[in-house]
């Protein structure tokens, strides 16, 4: 990844089979592993932080780039604005979250296990509801920093099924998590009232980066051996 960071790299992909990814430091014990296995839901750990996501009806994006002199939030903001421009081209008016929540307090609650139960600063929302969940990590390569940022763009409501795979035995807690996800998330299908055209969406997002960053992407195929590394990550 670091070797490719001389040129920014943008990828879009979907998950088959569906999978739950956990943040780098999140415990697998947060999940009901038996039920995940029975339903054919893979479990992976991301190299980035954050909380659990059920990768189902979504389009996942991944950006690898040199950080330069920019801070984590500056890079996050740059990528988010490009995504917002792409979503606008698709016909969706999204916005940035302006306030950073106190995650040290939020993570004490059992309802904090799902990523989409809260929005960080510069994450993308629609009418106050989280539409894109993202995470970033920096890797040191000699004297430079290389950024990996990836995220889930919700296309349908299947992400809410994550509640069924949590290691939560109290029905009241499970119900609260489900309610919070319902109230705090939005998906493109719900917003547009139509089935999301993934290829069209990816094309709009690609163009959004080009317009926001003043660049032109060069399309390249992904090496076959790369597809077998990291359980589909980044």
Predicted regions, residues:
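N-terminal low-complexity, intrinsically disordered segments
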Residues: 1-47
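Short acidic-glycine loop/turn motifs at beta-strand connectors
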Residues: 16, 56, 126-128, 143
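Short helix/loop capping segments that flank catalytic or ligand/cofactor-binding pockets
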Residues: 21-23, 30-32, 132-133, 157-158, ...
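A glycine-rich, hydrophobic loop/mini-helix early in the fold
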Residues: 30-71, 204
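Short, solvent-exposed loop/turn segments at the edges of secondary structure
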Residues: 56-58, 119, 148
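Internal, conserved structured core segments that host functional sites
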Residues: 60-121
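Long, positively charged amphipathic alpha-helical accessory segments at protein N-termini or as interdomain linkers
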Residues: 84-110, 137-234
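Aromatic/basic-lined ligand-recognition segments
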Residues: 114-136
């Amino acid at each position: 990844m670091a070797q490719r960071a001389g040129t920014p790299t943008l990828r879009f992909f979907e998950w088959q089979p569906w999978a739950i990814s956990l943040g780098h430091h999140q415990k697998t014990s947060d999940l009901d592993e038996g039920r995940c296995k029975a339903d054919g839901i893979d479990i992976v750990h991301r190299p980035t932080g954050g909380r659990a996501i059920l990768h189902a009806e979504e389009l996942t994006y991944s950006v690898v780039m040199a950080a330069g002199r920019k801070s984590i939030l500056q890079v996050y903001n740059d990528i988010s604005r490009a995504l917002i421009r792409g979503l606008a081209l698709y016909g969706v008016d999204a916005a940035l979250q302006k306030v950073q929540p106190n995650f040290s307090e939020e993570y004490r609650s059992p309802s904090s296990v799902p990523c989409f139960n809260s929005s960080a600063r510069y994450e993308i929302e629609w009418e106050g509801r989280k539409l894109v969940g993202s995470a970033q990590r920096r890797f040191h390569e000699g004297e430079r920093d290389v950024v990996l940022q990836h995220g889930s763009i919700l296309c349908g409501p299947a992400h809410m099924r994550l509640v069924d795979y949590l290691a939560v035995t109290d029905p009241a807690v499970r119900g609260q998590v489900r309610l919070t996800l319902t109230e705090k998330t939005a998906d493109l299908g719900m917003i547009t009232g139509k089935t999301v055209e993934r290829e069209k969406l990816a094309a709009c997002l690609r163009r959004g980066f080009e317009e926001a960053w003043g660049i032109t992407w060069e399309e390249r195929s992904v090496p076959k051996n790369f597809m077998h590394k990291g359980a589909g990550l980044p």
